[in-house]
UniProtKB/Swiss-Prot annotation:
Physiological role: Catalyzes the phosphorylation of the 3'-hydroxyl group of dephosphocoenzyme A to form coenzyme A.
Protein name: Dephospho-CoA kinase
Annotated gene: coaE
Matches recorded under CDD domains: DPCK
Annotated metabolic or biological route of this protein: Cofactor biosynthesis; coenzyme A biosynthesis; CoA from (R)-pantothenate: step 5/5
Length: 201
C-alpha cells in the first residue's frame, strides 16, 4: 500500500490550509470528515443508527441530519461523543483504506481531525500534527461558526489535549506566521515524505 501520512490538529489549527498546500504539490488528499458526511447522508445505515440513538430531534425538515444539533450534543456529553465515534470510526477507517488502494501520488495525505491514536489506523507511516496559538484558533472558530468566544472555548475544551496529540505525532508543524511561511514548511515536509516514500518502495 502507498506510503501514507495522517494529518491532524485541533479545530481551527490550519489543517485544511496545510492539506490544500500538499494537494497543490500533486499529493492525493483523503478527508475523513468528508467520508463521515457521506456515510451519514440521508438513508444510509449510519444515518438510521444515529436517528435511532438520538431521536427525531436531530433530523431537519428536509430529512437530512441536523449536524449542528448533533455537534452541540456531543460537545456537551462525552458519552454521546464516544458512542458516535464508535459507530463512525470503523467504517471511516475502512473507506480510507479503500481510497488508499487507488492513490496515484508518491505518498498520500489523510486528514483525520481526531487522530491521537495511531494504532487505530495501522496503514499510517507518519502522523503530522498542526499546532496554532490559542488566540488564532479562537478567532478562526468565532469567524467560521459565528459563535461567541465562550462557545469557541467550549469547542476547544472537547478536543484531545496537546500532550495526547504530541504523543501520537512524528512531525509537528507550527502555524504561527503567515501563509508564505506555512507553505515553505509544507514544501520542506513534502521533500522529506517523498524521500521516505521512495525508501519504503
Amino acid at each position: 500500500m502507498v506510503y501514507s501520512v495522517g494529518l491532524t490538529g485541533n479545530i481551527a489549527s490550519g489543517k485544511s490550509t496545510v492539506a490544500e498546500f500538499f494537494s497543490e504539490l500533486g499529493i492525493n488528499v483523503i478527508y475523513a470528515d468528508k467520508i463521515a458526511k457521506e456515510l451519514t447522508s440521508k438513508n444510509t445505515p449510519c444515518y438510521q443508527d444515529i436517528i435511532s440513538h438520538f431521536g427525531s430531534s436531530v433530523v431537519l425538515n428536509n430529512g437530512e441530519l441536523d449536524r449542528k444539533r448533533i455537534r452541540d450534543i456531543i460537545f456537551s456529553n462525552s458519552n454521546e461523543r464516544l458512542w458516535l465515534e464508535s459507530l463512525l470510526h470503523p467504517v471511516i477507517r475502512k473507506k480510507i483504506e479503500e481510497q488508499l488502494i487507488v492513490c496515484t501520488s508518491p505518498y498520500c495525505l489523510i486528514e483525520i481531525p481526531l487522530l491521537f491514536n495511531k494504532h487505530h489506523y495501522p496503514y499510517l507511516q507518519k502522523v503530522l500534527l498542526v499546532i496554532a496559538p490559542l488566540e488564532s484558533q479562537l478567532d478562526r472558530i468565532v469567524k467560521r461558526d459565528h459563535c461567541t468566544k465562550k462557545q469557541a472555548l467550549a469547542i476547544l475544551a472537547t478536543q484531545p489535549n496537546l500532550e495526547q496529540r504530541l504523543e501520537a505525532a512524528d512531525d509537528v508543524l507550527i502555524n504561527e506566521s503567515g501563509l508564505s511561511e506555512l507553505k515553505a514548511k509544507v514544501n520542506k515536509l513534502h521533500q522529506k515524505y517523498l524521500r521516505e516514500a521512495k525508501i519504503k518502495q
